[in-house]
Amino acid sequence: MRLSELMAGDQAALKHAQGQDPDITGLTADSRTVKDGYIFAALSGAKDDGSKYIADAIKLGAAAILAKDGTPRPSAPTVPLIPVENPRKRYAQLAARFYGQQPANIAAITGTNGKTSTAIFTEQLWTIMGNMSGSIGTLGIRAAGAKIPGSLTTPDPVALHQGLNEMYEIGVTHVAMEASSHGLDQYRLDGVKVTVAAFTNLSRDHLDYHGSFDKYFAAKARLFSDLLVADGTAVLNADVEQFATLKAMCEKRGLTVMSYGENADDIKLVSAIPDSTGTKLTLLANKGEYKIHLPLMGSFQVMNALAALAIVIASGADIDPAVLALEKLEGVRGRMELVGKTSFGAPVFVDYAHTPDALETVIKAVRPHCKGRIVCVFGAGGDRDTGK
């Protein structure tokens, strides 16, 4: 793909290219991975500035440089520098254009807790209902049974759009992906055609990065204000404090809103009764009552399952088979996962809970299933949000 193709419609960028129109073979923001024909995005971060590595990138064969307005031009006259106001956002948009194709139905899930489980449950429901489905998040990229390990909740733009393109090429039509506050704040999801956006909940996390709770919420809200397509649907937890704010934001854009939870108008949780193998649910949806057995323990898993249900309905699934499919859900690895029993028969669970709210939630979830003492073992990484 020529630079002029990649920058199509951006006259300012083409002007800065000064007649140079190299063949672009890839994109990267890591100067060490530059190859012949790559665009090097000189991004600034909390600890380093990519503009320091422009010369290194050119030595390795960079065909063009994407950088912030005001960045000095490189000494190599044949390597154009494209200055933009927001290099991170533009980098993601270029990655989307370079890789080209995406599955038709992409649901992005944000919130402090529940993103992974909701994404995997959504993928499972779509698959049960006969759709070629995949997911992207903390557990890596999953598509048609294959798994590609990952370490970030939201991958960098190149890995993300490459993954979406590969999913499209193998026939995946439905993708559920996690949208972290870091990923949203750093514009990693820009260029993704999000058709359904879901919000699970919000509690203290990542304040070492965002600086305040308001900024943390604002990063999450970008999914609804900036990224959800104009004819998309917002799936919102009606039981959280942020519901009214997000609903008003979405309605102002003319978006469809679908709510779930005890206070919801669309998928209303009437009752959730725990038993030895899961939870008995009574739901009101589409003017009908549904009684099903969810094979998952914990009220938080109930909410994650309802979020997934709302997502698949918002993406076009018929409500009756979608609700019945909840009875076939399987637990997610590392999320309230039963890994064994002690010598005296006490069950041992592993859970990803790492925030104060998540720890409290998971302990409350096991209480109905435990007559005696609950032992909780947890750790805390250093150098992060000490208030947790």
Model-derived features with residue positions:
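Phosphate-binding loop of NTP-binding sites
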Residues: 10, 90-238, 242-255, 285, ...
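N-terminal leader/targeting and accessory segments in enzymes
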Residues: 1-93, 97, 241, 268-273, ...
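Short gly/ser/thr-rich secondary-structure transition/capping motifs
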Residues: 18-27, 89-92, 155-158, 177-183, ...
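Active-site regions of enzymes building and remodeling cell-envelope glycoconjugates
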Residues: 76-85, 148-151, 254-257
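Active-site beta-alpha connecting loops in nucleotide-dependent enzymes
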Residues: 45-48, 332, 357-388
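Acidic, Mg2+-coordinating active-site environments of NTP-dependent enzymes
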Residues: 9-10, 71-77, 194-348, 371-372
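Conserved phosphate/oxyanion-binding catalytic-loop motifs
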Residues: 351
